[in-house]
């Protein structure tokens, strides 16, 4: 049997005309697209953020290319990006043989891009729009929750703070009552202050007053003395801590001590199947042809209250150009419908019962719900299932958690006694009373017609394969399920880089 033959292999062979890095990068490679796009956009805002004094800095265009290309290839760590610039031909070509270390990359990402990345992202979107790849006028909007880089056991809950403050209030009232009962008549305590809105100033004054009163009193009960010592030692510090925590919470119900901007939310990835809450951010995006056109981050676990800020960001970036918005039932509130109507944006936005109403079997069922009652606008009356008039009896006002005020009308039937449908129609005693939100009802009727039009059916179909696959691609294909940076400002930078990376990947595909 003969010897095997191999191709020549001389590791130390010198080359008379060695190839350049440019020769090693294919002409159609993604890395060239990254370089071309960043070369075309205006980076003046980023360049102006550098000072003219001191040692020469790495060029921001080079650092931006390296970071964006890293995010395209699932390289999110600054240390791995540092290594790639020394070991990977594509990164070496992008950086022109510069070798920024991980501290430089981190400072660039966390500091230099803080006030500039949004304008860079907008420039990329406008460049793609000019090429006809996307539209900034018709978008598909959806949200997802992404876990924050925070310890899931370092939580602060608003309810816990309120409970602790209520306990403090009761203990102060109790010790005050005791001090009044044992104090001398000439040194008797006045009535206790109002602890309803307890704060640090009230607590400090109350503690000082109680200590003075009890110090003048003989034979103070040992348990009460121990209780007063505990209050003196802990309450002033605790109430200050609670006030600081409430200031951080704002309108939220929780936050993480590790990342104070993160809110505890229920994630889709629940491997223990116990509904555990984790600190995270609600990421909202608008897409067109699977390109990300706009993004915002929110502390709200639900999508309903995110739409206004999301649209305002779109207008801030591109002006008032939005013509239509398509979204799921999570956005179908009266407040959002009013917002879209005010801004003349076509609302292809489902409401919570829309999908059920599409089912013919559901519509055939006899329903006694208030939305099924016939309304006569001329008489301003409703008709119950038995045909009896239900007269208007007054208004009801409600405020949503966002502060939006809803106006409802109340109607009452005249005689439900002895009605054969009484048990099925309503369970309460007396005549049936219903509340109707006519404004929301009109919005839903308009949206129902719009969604069932030819254009609406097409929009509903496209939403499923336009915006939703973008999240699936980023979270599953590119393994980004948890932010690496902390604080909302840095997390927004991170998501902005992911959005630019997604758009370039889509352009190349």
State where each predicted segment sits:
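Hydrophobic alpha-helical membrane-insertion signals
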Residues: 1-32
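Anion-binding and metal-coordination hotspots
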Residues: 4, 8, 67, 74-87, ...
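A generic alpha-helix surface/boundary motif
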Residues: 15, 63-64, 122
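Basic, short loop/linker segments at the boundary and entry of helix-turn-helix/winged-helix-like folds
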Residues: 26-68
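A short secondary-structure junction motif
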Residues: 40-45, 88, 92, 477
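Conserved catalytic-core motifs characterized by acidic clusters
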Residues: 95
């Amino acid at each position: 049997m003969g010897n095997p033959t191999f191709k020549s292999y001389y590791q130390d062979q010198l080359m008379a005309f060695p190839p350049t890095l440019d020769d090693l990068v294919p002409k159609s490679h993604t890395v060239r697209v990254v370089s071309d796009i960043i070369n075309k956009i205006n980076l003046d805002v980023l360049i102006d953020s550098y000072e003219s004094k001191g040692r020469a800095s790495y060029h921001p265009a080079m650092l931006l290319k390296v970071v964006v290309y890293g995010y395209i290839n699932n390289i999110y760590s600054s240390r791995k990006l540092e290594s790639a610039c020394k070991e990977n031909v594509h990164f070496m070509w992008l950086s022109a043989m510069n070798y920024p270390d991980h501290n430089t990359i981190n400072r660039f990402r966390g500091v230099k891009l803080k006030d500039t990345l949004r304008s860079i992202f907008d420039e990329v979107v406008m460049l793609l729009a000019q090429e006809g790849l996307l539209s900034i006028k018709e978008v598909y909007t959806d949200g997802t929750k992404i876990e924050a880089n925070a310890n899931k056991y370092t939580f602060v809950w608003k309810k816990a703070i309120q409970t602790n403050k209520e306990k403090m209030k009761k203990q102060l009232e109790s010790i005050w009552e005791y001090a009044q009962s044992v104090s001398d008549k000439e040194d008797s305590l006045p009535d206790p202050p109002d602890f309803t809105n307890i704060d640090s100033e009230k607590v400090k004054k109350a503690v000082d007053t109680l200590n003075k009163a009890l110090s003048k009193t003989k034979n103070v009960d040992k348990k009460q003395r121990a209780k007063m010592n505990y209050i003196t030692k802990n309450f002033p510090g605790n109430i200050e801590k609670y006030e600081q925590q409430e200031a951080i919470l704002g309108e939220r119900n929780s936050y993480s001590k590790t990342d104070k901007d993160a809110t505890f939310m229920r994630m889709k990835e629940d491997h223990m199947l116990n509904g555990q809450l984790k600190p995270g951010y609600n990421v909202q995006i608008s897409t067109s042809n699977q390109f990300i056109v706009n993004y915002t981050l929110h502390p709200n676990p639900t999508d309903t209250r995110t739409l206004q800020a999301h649209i305002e960001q779109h207008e801030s970036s591109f002006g008032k150009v939005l013509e239509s918005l398509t979204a799921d039932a999570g956005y179908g509130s009266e407040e959002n419908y009013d917002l879209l109507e005010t801004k003349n944006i076509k609302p292809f936005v489902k409401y919570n019962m829309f999908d059920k109403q599409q089912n013919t079997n559901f519509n055939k069922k006899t329903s006694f719900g208030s939305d099924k009652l016939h309304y006569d606008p001329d008489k301003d009356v409703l008709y119950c299932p038995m045909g009896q008039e239900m007269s208007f009896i007054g208004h009801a006002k409600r405020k949503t958690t966002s502060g939006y005020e809803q106006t409802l009308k109340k109607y009452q039937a005249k005689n439900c006694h002895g009605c054969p449908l009484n048990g099925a129609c309503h369970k309460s005693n007396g005549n049936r009373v219903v509340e109707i939100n006519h404004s929301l009802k009109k919005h839903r009727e308009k949206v129902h017609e719009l969604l069932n039009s030819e254009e609406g059916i097409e929009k509903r179909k496209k939403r499923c394969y336009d915006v939703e696959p973008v999240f699936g691609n980023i979270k599953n294909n590119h393994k980004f399920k948890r932010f690496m940076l902390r604080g909302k400002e840095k997390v927004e930078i991170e998501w902005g880089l992911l959005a630019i990376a997604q758009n370039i990947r889509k352009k190349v595909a």
